A protein has these predicted regions:
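Short, Lys/Arg-enriched N-terminal segments with co-localized hydrophobic residues
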Residues: 2-15
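Walker A/P-loop phosphate-binding motif and the immediately C-terminal alpha-helix
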Residues: 17-54
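Residue-level signature of catalytic and energy-coupling elements of molecular machines
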Residues: 25, 97, 116, 137, ...
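N-terminal phosphate/diphosphate-binding loop that engages ATP/GTP or pyrophosphate donors
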Residues: 39-99
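Flexible beta-alpha connector loops of hexameric P-loop NTPases
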Residues: 101-111, 167
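Conserved catalytic-core segment of NTP-binding enzymes
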Residues: 122-129, 133, 138-222, 231
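C-terminal boundary of histidine-terminating zinc-finger modules
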Residues: 235-246
Length: 262
């Protein structure tokens, strides 16, 4: 059955662009994805954001800072038969799903991602809603079979890696690049490049540029460090929603536009 779901995802959504964002935990990946999703929605696109992390906090900035119900949480409770149980539309208009994960110490988080993706496929959610973009926000510290799910079977068309110039962040990025290259099925996602989320460490852009060259991956976009990000998070919102006229909002909008152009 799983194979048929993979094949189905290879065929559907000719107009829909499915994009996976990977990166080390704590690097600002979810913040980046959430602001890109909000910026694309602001442009008039229908956007889905799918959180693929057992912490289930990818979409909190579309939900007033609160964690929503998850696919796996609904399944564990004996539900999950209707997407209304776990799909919600955020304050900025983004459609949000959190895959969720097992109870701590009781199972494999990667397997949980697989189970959640299968339920989303069984309910034909993307066919029903016809989004323009589906953004997968994926934990990139460990790229096991489950967390590599968006790279397989046509779930994602493109992959971006979010990193800073910090050593461990770049190490995680290198592992993600290896994972993308190791997946050789016909629907392998295209690695588009690195999004630098600056931490303002010494010679940061030079360090990322050198690492990117070594990995054979281009630097796609560089986001400056801004206190507006923390201020927006304190409000439980994206920068795009909380500070629409700010310089940081303009940066996220530029990134979203570049991603949309492909």
């Amino acid at each position: 059955m799983r194979k048929s779901i993979f094949l189905m995802h290879c065929k559907i959504g000719e107009k829909m662009k499915k994009i996976a964002f990977y990166g080390k935990g704590g690097i600002g990946k979810s913040t980046t994805v959430s602001n890109v999703a909000a910026a694309l929605t602001k442009k008039g696109y229908k956007v889905f954001q799918v959180g693929c992390d057992p912490k289930s906090d990818s979409t909190v900035m579309h939900n007033g800072g609160k964690r929503p119900a998850t696919v796996l949480g609904c399944i564990r409770a004996g539900g999950g038969e209707d997407e209304s149980e776990f799909l919600f539309r955020g304050t900025s208009g983004v459609f949000c799903i959190e895959a969720g994960g097992p109870q701590p110490g009781t199972g494999c988080a990667g397997r949980g991602i697989i189970a959640a993706f299968e339920r989303i496929a069984e309910l034909n959610i993307y066919e029903k809603y016809s989004p323009d973009f589906v953004l997968f926000d994926v934990l990139g510290d460990v790229v096991c079979g489950g967390f590599a799910m968006p790279l397989r079977g046509g779930y994602a068309d493109e992959v971006y890696i979010v990193t800073s110039g910090e050593m461990m962040s770049l190490y995680a990025a290198e592992n993600i690049v290896r994972a993308v290259k190791n997946i050789g099925n016909p629907c392998r996602a295209l690695l588009k490049g690195i999004i630098v989320n600056k931490k303002n460490i010494e010679k940061e852009e030079e360090k990322v540029a050198a690492a990117a060259e070594e990995m054979g991956v281009p630097v796609f976009f560089t986001l400056p460090r801004s206190m507006e990000v923390q201020k927006a998070e304190a409000l439980g919102k994206t920068v795009v929603e909380a500070f629409p006229g700010s310089e940081m909002c303009a940066e996220y909008e530029k990134l979203a536009e570049k991603i949309a152009r492909g």
